[in-house]
């Protein structure tokens, strides 16, 4: 099960008790103090791991504790430090104070390790308290307590391409067709109730991550339906693929404008992402009807049909595609018709999207 929001109570370890001990040796009836210090309590760290994709490993764990420090021993033997607690999280995890709502960490980079809570300091053993007036102190310090914080972890998926469309538009089918993701697919609205990630292999050494974002409806940015809960997952997606259902009762242009409006209402920044448009379920229409609807949609967007067909698009269906090297980000990179079921233009879509992904990665690395 995908979990994107979890609350935990986290404890760092308590410091170990300092020891009260006296040196015991043959012929030394009253040896001096030699109680060792207690060990420090374990710290709490967050570690970002790109191979972790969800927060589901925290399911059912309400309280997590680092180990307490061990008490000191005689002969000035220092107590063992408590074992640290390392919380492994996927990239895109945000850590909030559950009570104040304050953002504590925004964890994005793979391998990033941050100290969250320091363990309590171990108490000093009695040898520290020997003085001219007190040669045999019977006092040692207790260890300092650890820290306790209630936190909320929130995961925002980080993907190269986010699929955006109304419920049942075919996003789950597409992602299962061109990636290694195997979502459950059924023919009803809100099939996808949680975001899913798929790794799309372009070649042996080249791939990109696609996020199947749950279908949104008009008013999602205002919290209607399940929309607002899931829109946050595309905030960090680098590019967007709008998916328009050509077999739907909804007019294609109306679908597109509604989706754009929802994204803009949710985040102006998100609405400015590089984007492309896939016209889905084209196999459900007669070829002449499909051509007519595609041509009208392209004209309604004030675009000119055609472009460099370097990706091997099927010529029987009209399309619009830009040159990636002269890309105008105010327009879609492409408008192409697809069918995941009949595999129409699926490979072409994959290669075209990868060009867009490479461009976005290159620009991000040069910033």
Swiss-Prot record:
Q: Which cofactor does it need?
A: Mg(2+)
Cleavable signal peptide: none
Main localization (coarse): cytoplasm
Keyword Membrane carried by entry: no
One Pfam family named in its UniProt record? GTP1_OBG
Where it sits in the cell: the answer is:
Cytoplasm
* Every OBG-type G domain range: 159-358
Entry binding sites for Mg(2+): 172, 192
Q: What would be an example GO MF term here?
A: GTP binding
The Obg domain covers 1-158
Q: What is its EC number?
A: 3.6.5.-
Purpose of the protein: An essential GTPase which binds GTP, GDP and possibly (p)ppGpp with moderate affinity, with high nucleotide exchange rates and a fairly low GTP hydrolysis rate. Plays a role in control of the cell cycle, stress response, ribosome biogenesis and in those bacteria that undergo differentiation, in morphogenesis control.
Q: What is this protein called?
A: GTPase Obg
């Amino acid at each position: 099960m995908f979990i994107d929001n979890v609350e935990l109570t986290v404890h760092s370890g308590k410091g170990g008790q300092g020891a009260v001990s006296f040196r015991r040796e043959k012929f030394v009836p009253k040896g001096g103090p030699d109680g060792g210090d207690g060990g420090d309590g374990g710290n709490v760290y967050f570690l970002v791991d790109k191979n972790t994709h969800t927060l589901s490993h925290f399911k059912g764990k309400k309280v997590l504790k680092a180990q307490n420090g061990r008490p000191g021993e005689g002969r000035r033997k220092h107590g063992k430090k408590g074992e640290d607690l390392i919380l492994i999280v996927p990239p895109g995890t945000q850590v909030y104070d559950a009570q104040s709502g304050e953002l504590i960490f925004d964890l994005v980079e793979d391998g990033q390790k941050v100290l969250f809570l320091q363990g309590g300091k171990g108490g000093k053993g009695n040898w520290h308290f020997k003085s001219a007036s007190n040669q045999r102190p019977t006092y040692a310090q207790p260890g300092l307590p650890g820290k306790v914080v209630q936190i909320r972890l929130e995961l925002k998926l980080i993907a190269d391409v986010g699929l955006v469309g109304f419920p049942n538009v075919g996003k789950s089918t597409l992602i299962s067709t061109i990636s290694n993701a195997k979502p459950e697919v059924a023919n009803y609205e809100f099939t996808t109730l949680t975001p899913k990630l798929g790794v799309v292999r372009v070649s042996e050494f080249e791939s990109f991550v696609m996020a199947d974002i749950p279908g949104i409806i008009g008013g999602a940015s205002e919290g209607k339906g399940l929309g607002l809960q899931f829109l946050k997952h595309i905030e960090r997606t680098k590019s967007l693929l709008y998916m328009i259902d050509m077999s739907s009762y909804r007019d294609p242009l109306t679908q597109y404008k509604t989706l754009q409006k929802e994204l803009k209402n949710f985040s102006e920044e998100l609405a400015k992402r590089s984007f492309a448009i896939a016209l889905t379920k084209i196999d459900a229409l007669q070829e002449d009807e499909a051509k007519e609807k595609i041509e009208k949609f392209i004209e309604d967007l004030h675009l000119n049909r055609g472009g460099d067909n370097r990706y091997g698009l099927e010529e029987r269906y009209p399309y619009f595609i830009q040159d990636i090297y002269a890309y105008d980000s105010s327009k879609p990179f492409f408008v192409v018709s697809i069918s995941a079921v009949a595999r129409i233009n699926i490979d072409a879509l994959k290669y075209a999207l990868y060009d867009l992904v490479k461009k976005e990665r290159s620009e991000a690395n040069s910033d």
